[in-house]
C-alpha cells in the first residue's frame, strides 16, 4: 500500500468513486466469458468515457473498444487506443470532419456503422478523397427499434448497395439487442433471438456472395446468456460481442440482470449537510450529480416504490435508507424505519456511498473518477469523453 496516497476522507464531495477490486473483477469476468465462448470482446465504453479504464479492458483481453457517437472516439484515439468501432451511424459535415481527423492518425483502425445509404455515400466520398477504403458494418435491427435495417432480405439488399460504393470496405453486420423481460429466462430468450436473426442474415449474405466475415451481437444484460450460447458452438458465425455497462454496473443493470448488486463498482460519495428533520437527512448531491433517471420502466417490479417514491440509487451498506427525494443540488435520504435506533441515525458530516441508478449519466457529469482500494485513492481517472471536453475539429 502506498502510504502517500490520498485517504478517502480527503475527497471533496460530491464525487464519483470506483472500487478498483470490483472494477478489475468485472473486467476479468467479461474477458473470461468471451474467451470461453471463443469470440472477441470489444467493450462499449459509454459507461465510463475513460481511456485509462479502456486500456485496462484491452490489457485484460479486449481486442479494441467501441464508442457510441463519433465524437467520443477522439479522446480514445488521442490516448493511443488503436482499434475503435463507432457504434452509431452518423451524418453531416461536422461528423465527417471528425472522421477525417481520425483517419489521419497513423496506425489507427476505425470501423464505422451505417443503416442508410445516405450515411454510407458521405463516408464513401471521404474514403475516395483519401484514396482508401473505410471499414464499414451494417447495423441490423433485431428488435431494439432504434438504429438498424431489418434482418434477412432487407439487410442483404442494403449490404449489396454498400458493397458497390467506392471508398468503403464492407466488413459485415452488427446487432445490439435490447428489451426482453428482466428474468433469466427473458435474457436467454433475447440472446437466442438476436443471435438467430444475426446468423440467419449472415448466412443469407454468404449465399448471395456478399463478403462480410464480421458478425457481432451483444449487450450487458445478455452477456452471460450470449456467451453460453456461443460456448455451445451453436452460432459459429458470430465473431465478436460488445457489452458495456457491466464493466461498472448500476442499479439499472442490477434490475436488468447485467450485474449483481455487489458487482456495482461506482458510487457517488456524498456528505450529510443536515440532519435537522428526524425523518431524513439532506445530502450535498442532487440530479446534477446523479442524473434524473428514476428507472420508471421497472415500476411494476416489487420494491420499486417506497411511500409512493422511486429511489435515485442504493445506499451502500444501508438497506434501511431510501434515497427518494432529489432536487438540483441536494437530495433527501429517508429513514425507512419510523423511529430508528440512535446508532442507525446519521449525523451532519457523515458520508454515504450511493450506487446511482444510471452510472452513464452520473459519470458523464464528472471530470474525474477516483479509483479507490482499501480506504484510499489508488488512482484518478479522467472522464475524457465528456462532450464538453471533446477537442474542437
Per-region residue spans from a language model:
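Generic N-terminal amphipathic, Lys/Arg-enriched alpha-helix
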Residues: 1-18
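N-terminal glycine-rich anion-binding loops that anchor highly charged ligand groups
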Residues: 2-3, 22-53, 66
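Conserved, mostly hydrophobic/aromatic
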Residues: 23, 46, 76, 138, ...
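Active-site-proximal beta-alpha core segment in soluble small-molecule metabolic enzymes
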Residues: 44-182
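Active-site loop/helix belt of alpha/beta enzymes
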Residues: 135, 142-258
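Active-site loop ensemble at the mouth of alpha/beta enzyme cores that anchors a bound cofactor
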Residues: 223-308
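C-terminal accessory subdomain/extension
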Residues: 279, 283-393
Amino acid at each position: 500500500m502506498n502510504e502517500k496516497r490520498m485517504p478517502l476522507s480527503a475527497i471533496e464531495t460530491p464525487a464519483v468513486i470506483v472500487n478498483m477490486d470490483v472494477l478489475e473483477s468485472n473486467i476479468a469476468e467479461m474477458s473470461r466469458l468471451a474467451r470461453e465462448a471463443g469470440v472477441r470482446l470489444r467493450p462499449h465504453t459509454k459507461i465510463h468515457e475513460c481511456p485509462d479504464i479502456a486500456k485496462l479492458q484491452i490489457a485484460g483481453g479486449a481486442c479494441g473498444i467501441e464508442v457510441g457517437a463519433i465524437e467520443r472516439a477522439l479522446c480514445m484515439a488521442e490516448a493511443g487506443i488503436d482499434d475503435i468501432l463507432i457504434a452509431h451511424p452518423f451524418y453531416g459535415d461536422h461528423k465527417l470532419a471528425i472522421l477525417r481527423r481520425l483517419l489521419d492518425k497513423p496506425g489507427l483502425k476505425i470501423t464505422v456503422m451505417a443503416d442508410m445509404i445516405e450515411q454510407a455515400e458521405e463516408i464513401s466520398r471521404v474514403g475516395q478523397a483519401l484514396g482508401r477504403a473505410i471499414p464499414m458494418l451494417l447495423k441490423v435491427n433485431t428488435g431494439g427499434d432504434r438504429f438498424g435495417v431489418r434482418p434477412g432480405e432487407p439487410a442483404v439488399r442494403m449490404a449489396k448497395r454498400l458493397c458497390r460504393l467506392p471508398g468503403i470496405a464492407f466488413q459485415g453486420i452488427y446487432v445490439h439487442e435490447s428489451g426482453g423481460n428482466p428474468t433469466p429466462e427473458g435474457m436467454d430468450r433475447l440472446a437466442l433471438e438476436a443471435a438467430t436473426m444475426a446468423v440467419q442474415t449472415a448466412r443469407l449474405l454468404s449465399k448471395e456472395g456478399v463478403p462480410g466475415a464480421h458478425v457481432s451481437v451483444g449487450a450487458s444484460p445478455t452477456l452471460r446468456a450470449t456467451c453460453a450460447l456461443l460456448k455451445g458452438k451453436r452460432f459459429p458465425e458470430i465473431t465478436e460481442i460488445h457489452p458495456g455497462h457491466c464493466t461498472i454496473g448500476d442499479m439499472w443493470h442490477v434490475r436488468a440482470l447485467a450485474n449483481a448488486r455487489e458487482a456495482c463498482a461506482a458510487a457517488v460519495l456524498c456528505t450529510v449537510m443536515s440532519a435537522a428533520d428526524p425523518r431524513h437527512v439532506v445530502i450535498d448531491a442532487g440530479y446534477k450529480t446523479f442524473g434524473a433517471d428514476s428507472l420508471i420502466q421497472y415500476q411494476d417490479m416489487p420494491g420499486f416504490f417506497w411511500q409512493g417514491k422511486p429511489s435515485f440509487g442504493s445506499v451502500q451498506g444501508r438497506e434501511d435508507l431510501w434515497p427518494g427525494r432529489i432536487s438540483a443540488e441536494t437530495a433527501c435520504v429517508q429513514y425507512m424505519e419510523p423511529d430508528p435506533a440512535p446508532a442507525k441515525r446519521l449525523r451532519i458530516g457523515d458520508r454515504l456511498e450511493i450506487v446511482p441508478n444510471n452510472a452513464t449519466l452520473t459519470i458523464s457529469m464528472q471530470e474525474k473518477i477516483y479509483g479507490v482500494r482499501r480506504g484510499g485513492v489508488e488512482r484518478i481517472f479522467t472522464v475524457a469523453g465528456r462532450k464538453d471536453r471533446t477537442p474542437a475539429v
